[in-house]
């Protein structure tokens, strides 16, 4: 018996059946492999504190330790015209507001001329010896181009701006999101106001949660 239209109710071709089964199996295996690839593919961190970086001694450090605090992330240099004023102001800010609720996080960068020529340890030692800084220093990084440090690229992608000189500053909230950024020559007083306001919010929130 044939169905309406003259088509047989069952396939009478064994080869066609085998081909259909084989095709179905191939598609199924392909879907499973695609799903496995997606599951195993490393996920891009969704916030700044989800990244790992190297400290000045080359040791891997998880930025997770700073979650719950405000962070001012800065690309620093030892031989820039702005070095002295920035290091002194940053240390004062770190001393006044940190480290319980706030930290300055310094990343030396050598992509702007000869303003940073030493090693990561040299940069840290210079800042400590010359300006008495106590905030954390990390390994020297690149912040521009294909070799940019992923953690710093997260900052620049967040604001759609790439630093054009040393001492750009990115304010990161307790959840790891960038809330403000400042260029090199912007007054520290405006930065201080923004950071202080964020730190106050953190303190008030913790008091409410107690």
Swiss-Prot record:
Catalytic activity: 2 glutathione + H2O2 = glutathione disulfide + 2 H2O
InterPro entries given in the database record: Glut_perox_Gpx7, Glutathione_peroxidase, Thioredoxin-like_sf
EC number: 1.11.1.9
Pfam families assigned to the protein according to its UniProt record, in alphabetical order: GSHPx
Disulphide connectivity of cysteines: none
Molecular function GO labels: glutathione peroxidase activity
Native organism taxonomy: Eukaryota, Metazoa, Chordata, Craniata, Vertebrata
Zinc keyword on record: no
Keyword entries, A-Z: Membrane, Oxidoreductase, Peroxidase, Transmembrane, Transmembrane helix
GO biological process, one term: response to oxidative stress
CDD domains per record: GSH_Peroxidase
Highest taxon in the source lineage: Eukaryota
Topology of this chain in the membrane: Single-pass membrane protein
Protein name, per record: Probable glutathione peroxidase 8
Organism field: Tetraodon nigroviridis
Membrane-traversing stretches: 21-40
Family affiliation: Belongs to the glutathione peroxidase family.
Keyword Transmembrane: yes
Location(s) in or outside the cell: Membrane
GO cellular component, one term: membrane
Catalytic EC class: oxidoreductase
């Amino acid at each position: 018996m044939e169905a309406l239209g003259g088509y047989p109710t069952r396939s009478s071709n064994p080869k066609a059946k085998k081909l259909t089964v084989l095709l179905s199996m191939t598609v199924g295996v392909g879907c499973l492999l695609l799903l496995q690839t997606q599951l195993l593919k490393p996920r891009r961190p969704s916030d700044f504190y989800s990244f790992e970086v190297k400290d000045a001694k080359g040791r891997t450090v998880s930025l997770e330790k700073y979650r719950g605090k405000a962070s001012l992330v800065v690309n620093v240099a030892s031989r820039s015209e702005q070095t002295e004023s920035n290091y002194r102001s940053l240390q004062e800010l770190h001393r006044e507001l940190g480290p319980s609720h706030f930290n300055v996080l310094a990343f030396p960068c050598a992509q702007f001329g000869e303003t940073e020529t030493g090693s990561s340890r040299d940069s840290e030692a210079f800042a400590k010896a010359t300006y008495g800084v106590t905030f954390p220093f990390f390994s020297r990084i690149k912040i521009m181009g294909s070799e940019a440090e992923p953690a710093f690229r997260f900052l620049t992608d967040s604001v759609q701006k790439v630093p054009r000189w040393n001492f750009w500053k990115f304010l990161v909230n307790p959840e790891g999101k960038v809330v403000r950024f400042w260029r090199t020559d912007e007054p520290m007083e405006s930065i201080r106001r923004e950071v202080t306001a964020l730190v106050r919010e953190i303190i008030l929130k913790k008091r409410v949660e107690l």
